[in-house]
Design a protein with these regions (language model features):
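C-terminal helical cap(s) of enzyme catalytic domains, especially alpha/beta-barrels
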Residues: 168-172, 195, 210-226
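N-terminal amphipathic alpha-helix/helix-capping segment at the start of soluble metabolic enzymes
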Residues: 1-22, 26-27
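Active-site beta-loop-alpha junctions enriched in small/polar residues
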Residues: 20-24, 57, 84, 107, ...
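Catalytic-face loop-and-helix region of soluble metabolic enzyme cores
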Residues: 148-204
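N-terminal active-site wall of soluble small-molecule enzyme domains
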Residues: 16, 28-129, 135-140, 166-169
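Glycine-rich phosphate-binding active-site loops on the catalytic face of alpha/beta enzymes
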Residues: 93-113, 150-159, 199-218
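Catalytic cores of alpha/beta
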Residues: 86-97, 134-144, 181, 185-204
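Short, low-complexity, charge-dense intrinsically disordered segments
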Residues: 227-234
Length: 234
């Protein structure tokens, strides 16, 4: 049985955090030298993350599927496979590796493919986080059964992040969908701005991976400690 990714992101009061495990990125290169996925996952779980995203792309992010399998065995949170999924095979592969959810990137897929992959994932008891970066992509996704919509603040052409992307696209998403803001979220002030706009969850990777104290940073983002006390963790 899978763990429900969608249910983990529902909350009445505080935002839910999908904490991401990634060793490297195209824009930054190696982000974290002392990279132990299982250890990081355990810190995430103990520090209040609602779900964990694991980068499994090898070429750009130095990830691998075995990271996901190892993480799944070591925590009780739902696990998202973060990768460039362009083929049904990768969806079966994700399920067999232990994923509870997969990322579908609207920019890479046609409306028909998104719908087909949503249905396949559903048959395999997995949720999908369907990611958009523009109004055109969002309109395409809203013509499918996507239930969890991620707004990526990072422009994949320039790698720059801008939270305005979330603020612009959020009002176009109908009630009843779970909305996730991804990338470029660094402080509790950022989180509070997103909560005001009705964002259910955020996906945070680099901010946590670059932190000297992952647990403190996660607590700060969740508003569990006063961010003025955390200058040393920057």
């Amino acid at each position: 049985r899978t763990r429900s990714f969608g249910d983990a992101l529902k909350s009445d009061n505080n935002i839910r955090i999908i904490a991401e495990i990634k060793k490297a990125s195209p824009s930054l290169g190696i982000i974290r030298e002392d990279f132990n996925p299982v250890e990081i996952a355990r810190i995430y779980e103990a520090s209040g993350a609602a779900a964990i995203s694991v980068l499994t792309d090898e070429k750009f992010f130095q990830g691998c599927l075995s990271y996901l399998t190892d993480v799944k065995k070591s925590v009780n949170l739902p696990i998202l496979r973060k990768d460039f999924i362009v083929d049904a095979y990768q969806i079966y592969e994700a399920r067999s590796a232990g994923a509870d959810a997969i990322l579908l990137i609207a920019a890479l897929l046609s409306k028909e493919e998104i719908q087909r992959y949503l249905e396949l994932a559903g048959e395999l008891d997995m949720d999908c986080l369907v990611e958009v970066h523009s109004e055109t992509e969002l309109k395409k996704v809203l013509q499918t059964n996507a239930h969890i919509i991620g707004i990526n603040n990072r422009d994949l052409a320039t790698f720059k992040t801008d939270m305005e992307t979330t603020l612009q696209l959020r009002p176009m998403i109908p009630a009843g969908k779970i909305v996730v803001s991804e990338s470029g979220i660094k402080t509790r002030a950022d989180v509070e701005k997103l909560m005001k706009e009705g964002i259910d969850a955020i996906l945070v990777g680099e901010t946590l991976m670059k932190s000297n104290n992952i647990s403190t940073k996660l607590h700060e983002l969740l508003g569990l400690i006063n961010h003025k006390d955390t200058k040393s963790t920057k």
